Amino acid sequence: MAKEALKTLQSMFGEMVASFVFGFAVYSAILGSSISQSSADKVIVGLTVGFSGIGVIYSFCDVTIAHFNPAITLAAILTSKIDVLQGLGYMLAQYIGFMLAVCALLVCSPVEYKETLDTIRPGPTDFGATSLNVFFAEFFLTAIFVHIVFATAVNPYKPKVDTEGKFVDPDEKEPVDRRITAPLCIGLTLGFLAFMGLASSGGAFNPGLTFAPMAMSNTWSHFWIYLGGQYLGGLTGGLLQVLVLYKLSSD
């Protein structure tokens, strides 16, 4: 019993640290590219999102769920892929991790507190994006992301087997082992989705990443637009994979 409790605590702590590392990487890239006024600022951020995601998943997946995204975890809870209380614990750990990432960035930032938070806080782009544009951008980006995460890691296809371990469907073949390639696939998805949101929402598709700088700056404009799109999109992507696009067996 004590060992199980310790494993749970380790897993929760691991999820918090994973969220911290990912958040610190992304926030640092956003701030650094903005301060340096690099012409490749969007590319820098997109590559950081993708590569840091790959590294975090590979290094933390043995001790925790390595979601570092509350939209994935909520979708997993509502599709019964994870226990409710455990899932809520992971979500809390994720939010704390992102808050700590903002705190760490503030200590490292060479510019003042307000400017740092204004720079990393998500908001509509300067191209005239409306609240509706932002909502649907975050909805579709998060739906795509969560669907891919479910298909490769949370709910990958597993053929039915009998008591002897043989396939129930004689025509069934051993499925592709995605354990090695899933982090790479998810990280690359993070990267290309970050580029897809450039015209409207900026491409956050992560409630934790969105919430932390808003909470630290006490600036809540567009908060519900972002979180509403992200959580609804995540649930849609998860349900689509579980109920509609999970491979059907022929038995």
From Swiss-Prot:
Residue numbers covered by motif NPG: 206-208
UniProt cross-references to Pfam families, sorted A to Z: MIP
Motif (NPA): 69-71
Keywords, sorted A to Z: Cell membrane, Membrane, Repeat, Transmembrane, Transmembrane helix, Transport
Cytoplasmic side: 1-11, 64-86, 155-179, 246-251
Molecular function per GO: water channel activity
GO cellular component: plasma membrane
Residues spanning the membrane: 12-32, 43-63, 87-107, 134-154, 180-200, 225-245
Annotated localization: Cell membrane
Membrane topology: Multi-pass membrane protein
PROSITE patterns in alphabetical order: MIP
Side of membrane Extracellular, spans: 33-42, 108-133, 201-224
InterPro entries documented for this protein: Aquaporin-like (IPR023271), Aquaporin_transptr (IPR034294), MIP (IPR000425), MIP_CS (IPR022357)
Main location as per UniProt: membrane
Cited function: Water channel required to facilitate the transport of water across membranes. Involved in osmotolerance.
Domain notes: Aquaporins contain two tandem repeats each containing three membrane-spanning domains and a pore-forming loop with the signature motif Asn-Pro-Ala (NPA). In microsporidia, the second signature motif differs slightly and is Asn-Pro-Gly (NPG).
Family stated for the protein in its record: Belongs to the MIP/aquaporin (TC 1.A.8) family.
Protein name: Aquaporin
The organism of origin for this protein: Encephalitozoon intestinalis (Microsporidian parasite)
